[in-house]
Amino acid sequence: MKLLVVAVGHRMPAWVDAGFDEFARRMPRELPLQLIEVKAEPRTSGKPVEAMMAAEAARIEAVLPPRCRRVVLDERGGDRTTAALARRLEAWQGEGEDVAFIVGGPDGLAPSLKASAAESLRLSSLTLPHALVRPLLAEALYRAWTVTRNHPYHRE
């Protein structure tokens, strides 16, 4: 089983890549965390936002494994505590399918992509910079894994 972060956009600041890579490196071999970047649709005047999101959705669909659990990151998604995310992680491991966490572009995700997801997750009620999602999600997944292993990284 793999954890995939499929994110629209590339050429993130060095701190974004360093943060993501640090927590991906800490994950165990049996639960690798991998980043797949998808090119953002150019924001040009006169092009409807819906068309740009649809183009990004097609690129996302093209890189998703055929059988994977889709979890979209969305500001209207469900809140999860670390303990709840750890329980979900254990359940996903029991099912054995890859899990793809899908991060949209500046305008979010196309409705069709949201509808195809098994779950929707909100990282925070705060408005955060788009680039912060990658290292924040990687840390949350690493922390959830440490909870499942009673590792001292997470403290209540």
Curated annotation (Swiss-Prot):
It comes from the Bacteria. The keyword Translocase does not apply. Pfam families: SPOUT_MTase (PF02590). Its main location: cytoplasm. Its EC number is 2.1.1.177. InterPro entries: Alpha/beta_knot_MTases, RlmH-like, tRNA_m1G_MTases_N. It is found in: Cytoplasm. SUPFAM superfamilies: alpha/beta knot. One of its GO terms (molecular function) is rRNA (pseudouridine-N3-)-methyltransferase activity. It catalyses: pseudouridine(1915) in 23S rRNA + S-adenosyl-L-methionine = N(3)-methylpseudouridine(1915) in 23S rRNA + S-adenosyl-L-homocysteine + H(+). GO terms for cellular component: cytoplasm. S-adenosyl-L-methionine binds at L73, G104, L123, S124, S125, L126, T127, L128. The keyword Methyltransferase applies. Keywords: Cytoplasm, Methyltransferase, rRNA processing, S-adenosyl-L-methionine, Transferase. PANTHER family: METHYLTRANSFERASE (PTHR33603), RIBOSOMAL RNA LARGE SUBUNIT METHYLTRANSFERASE H (PTHR33603:SF1). Belongs to the RNA methyltransferase RlmH family. Specifically methylates the pseudouridine at position 1915 (m3Psi1915) in 23S rRNA. Homodimer. This is Ribosomal RNA large subunit methyltransferase H.
